Amino acid sequence: DADASQADMLRMRLGMYRLRADVTITDAALFVHRGLGPVPKDGFADPRHTEMGWRAYRDAPQTDETVDWTALRVALMIPETGIELTPDTFILEAQFEAINGVDFRKGCYVGQEVTARMKHKTTLRKGLASVAIDGLAETGTEITADGKVAGTLLSQAGNSGIAYLRFDRATGEMTAGGAKVTRKDTGN
């Protein structure tokens, strides 16, 4: 699924990859429903993280939203297209391996060579990371450490955030505007 603001771009991008396949890509005009708890018969477990609950595609919009999905997604480090994910994002830098977004056993796919090389021959030097924020900072604010640019704050929900960081500089105390920033995960 894709946000309505991203649908045309996604349809155009998928059209580039269909090559000679007899496939028509159209807008399904369905609405995403999501929830926590048991998965309904017409739904499926969100594959990105067990705590993200379930999703279903239905004809009418959801009217019973009770979960702050943005806060949950940011706390779980689930990047979203148009916010943390841009057209030039490398999927491993976006932590796609952790959210079941890439399979190294699959055959051919666009970007496979670059992705495999990044996985097997190098250590990531930069990418998305979960951060704790003490204070308020606007999204897009530069994050600094020891007077050097360490990254950019991309999202904030409460005291959690998602930032794009240079991992070599994001090892200690950092700031974004007047807010104190601390890296939560240390996987890279």
Go through the PLM ranges and name each one.
Residues 36, 108, 112, 152:
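Gly/Ser/Thr-rich helix-start
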Residues 67-120, 124-125, 130:
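A mid-sequence, solvent-exposed acidic-amphipathic segment
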